[in-house]
Design a protein with these regions (language model features):
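Exposed, interaction-prone extracellular/peripheral surfaces
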Residues: 1-49, 57, 62-67, 76, ...
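Conserved AdoMet
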Residues: 70
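Short, Gly/Ser/Thr-enriched beta-strand-loop segments that form substrate-interacting elements
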Residues: 73
Length: 323
């Protein structure tokens, strides 16, 4: 989906490189925005309950950069040359992995929104990272190293900037196939407009590893409504292909039908995997999807463990809760 463009149009590869450098330059401000959003959301979330037998089981790991000194187990560390951090076993096993689509299609912003899809997806990912870290969780990008502590979100931001500079657009548009640990969760941020025959194998590869998945579909409102009228030139963001419509409004009904069909097919796949879908439009506040996503990660007992919906209930994957 793309707005009308000038006749002189840079190649997709050049656009990707230019946008990657621009994204790296904007990352500090996006990180600030994400922390502001996460603090707003945190005020609306009640304290977590940490109950159950898992609290009595502990395991140790080496102290990492970004860990607080308060987490060091000094008794265990005294008998070694290393500093050790003590973690509850259920906390250590629970890692939330994230992935953000950084392909060219995510650069789209229409006149109906103040934020490109890419910026909003990054802000959502960083803000979610902050909330998870505040809850004691381990977070990381798929293919990276999960972390806890104050520096975890900074590492996610750094990883996103590096991947924007180094990844090809083909790599950027689909979730990676990196191995993940069982009992973890994965949150994917994208417009998810890729053909399902390309996307579905990637989702299945993650699901068979025993992880629970949550998809956040980030769309510009114009991608839902196709508000253009009259003679309009459209450009495919990732291929550079162009199409001129004499009366853009005449395409609206068929376009909307294809969007609905694509989303319904995606939802069918997610029902099969017992994963969830959340639709977010960039003209809406970022706090809205974060509250919903946090509730889904919290599950029924507010311990951040995903609970699949009851049989016959599809609220977790219905776009009716679109934010």
């Amino acid at each position: 989906m793309a707005p009308p463009v000038d006749t002189e149009h840079a190649s997709p590869i050049h656009e990707l490189e230019t946008r990657a450098h621009a994204l790296a330059a904007r990352m500090p401000s996006l990180l600030v925005a994400a922390r502001r959003v996460s603090h707003t959301v945190a005020h609306g979330i009640h304290g977590r309950r940490r109950r159950g037998p898992g609290e009595t089981f502990w395991q140790f790991r080496h102290f990492e950069s970004g860990d607080s000194a308060d987490t060091v187990d000094w008794r265990r560390s005294a008998s070694s040359d290393h500093l050790y951090v003590r973690e509850r076993e259920w906390e250590a096993a629970h890692t939330v992995w994230m992935w953000v689509d950084q392909s060219l299609s995510m650069a789209f912003r229409s006149h109906l929104s103040a934020s490109p899809k890419a910026d909003r997806a990054i802000v959502l990912a960083l803000a979610m990272s902050e909330l998870l870290v505040l809850g004691g969780e381990r977070v990381g990008l798929i293919g990276g190293r999960p972390r806890t502590g104050r520096m975890a979100t900074n590492q996610v931001a750094l990883g996103l900037a590096r991947r924007a500079l180094n990844a090809s657009d083909e790599d950027a548009s689909l979730p990676p196939t990196s191995p993940l640990g069982a009992f973890s969760e994965v949150v994917l941020f994208s417009d998810f407009l890729e053909p399902l025959e390309q996307l579905t194998p990637r989702l299945e590869h993650l699901a068979v590893q025993g992880v629970r998945g949550h998809l956040v579909q980030v769309l510009d409102p114009a991608e839902e409504s196709l508000p253009y009228t009259g003679r309009t030139e459209f450009t495919a963001s990732e291929t550079g292909e162009r199409m001129i419509a004499g009366r853009a409004e005449s395409l609206r009904e068929k376009y909307h039908a294809r969007m609905v069909a694509h989303r319904e097919a995606l939802m069918d796949e997610l029902r099969r995997l017992k994963w969830s879908l959340l639709v977010h439009h960039t003209d809406r506040p970022p706090e809205e999807p974060l509250l919903t996503l946090h509730a889904r990660l919290a599950g029924l007992e507010h311990d951040y463990r995903y609970r699949p919906p009851a049989e016959g209930l599809d609220d977790d994957i219905a776009p009716a809760g679109a934010a």
